[in-house]
Amino acid sequence: SDFKGFAACPGVQVAACCDVDTMKTERFRRRVAEWQASKGMNQRCDQYEFYEDLLERKDIDAIEVATPENWHALATIHSCQSGKDVYCQKPLAYTISEGLAMVKAVRNNKRVLQVGSQQRSSKEFQAAIDMVQNGAIGHIEKIYARVGEPPTPLSLPEMPVPANLNFNQWMGPLNDPKIHYHPDLCPPISLDPEENEKLWGAWRWYQETGNGYTADWGAHMFDIAQAAIGMDGSGPVEFTPKGYNGTQYSTMRYANGIVMTEQPYLEDNPDAQGIKFVGDNGWIEVARGYINCSDQSKIPSDLK
């Protein structure tokens, strides 16, 4: 899906693609070739199985890292070291230490790194941030953020690895003998996509391969909350996980005293991912395609 965004930028040419599944690189190459031909471009899109080979090319300016999150750190660090700027999908890193190493690589190599937090550009989230910062509901007392459940133990049965997939390379830094191939982790695709084709890898939902909804949706929702309360360049100073000393929900406390609780807040849709800001003069609820406020007059007219 990110290809559409790059394609809309004048002068951008997609020169190469890399994946551990050769079926995916071939399908992507065909899609790029069709698009570039329609624009009168003759840039060839080369295919790679190992990203290190791609990074050796001097004619490539920037890389997108859209792998499972266990590869984000190494791919980003190596891209920076090879002189490439990086657009990395969220969540930025698999662990905190990896994230710090990525920041160091960007700064040491004077590169540009952008993270896929496109939700912040959506009108309803921009409006919510502005409303909070402009005092629409007074002093913020607490925040509820609903992102979903943390990861669960891997419980998928082992299945034969497709011939077109290098599963050892897919695992990469994980190096865990408990992890084995199952199509839910890395869904097979065809060159001629079916209407009901499954593309969403379930690796993100398991402890051994991902960080669950907490990272997948938290990267979006926690980002909005931090931006609204002026903690954009920081993070919580205290985290209490769900179940610790009998706590029902996870909480994050910030240096300014505000506590964000990860729990449902919409009675009619408890599974919805979104945020509720509670102030001493009202509340604001925001999710994708939705915004509400205790004082309807505070909502921008184009969002009512």
Positions of the model-derived regions?
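Contiguous beta-strand/loop segments that form the cofactor/metal-binding neighborhood of enzyme cores
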Residues: 127, 139, 144-304
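Conserved structured core elements
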Residues: 69, 73, 93-96, 122, ...
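Short helix-terminating capping/connector loops at secondary-structure junctions
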Residues: 38-44, 138, 233-235
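Active-site-proximal cap/loop segments of hydrolase catalytic domains
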Residues: 17, 32-35, 96-99, 107, ...
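Alpha-helix termination/capping residues and helix-transition junctions
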Residues: 9-11, 57, 134-137, 164, ...
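A contiguous active-site-proximal alpha/beta segment in oxidoreductase catalytic domains
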Residues: 85-87, 93-171
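N-terminal glycine-/serine-/threonine-rich beta1-alpha1-beta2 phosphate-ribose binding loop
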Residues: 1-88, 97-112
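Active-site-proximal beta-strand/loop segments in catalytic clefts of secreted hydrolases
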Residues: 18-21, 50-51, 66-67, 91, ...
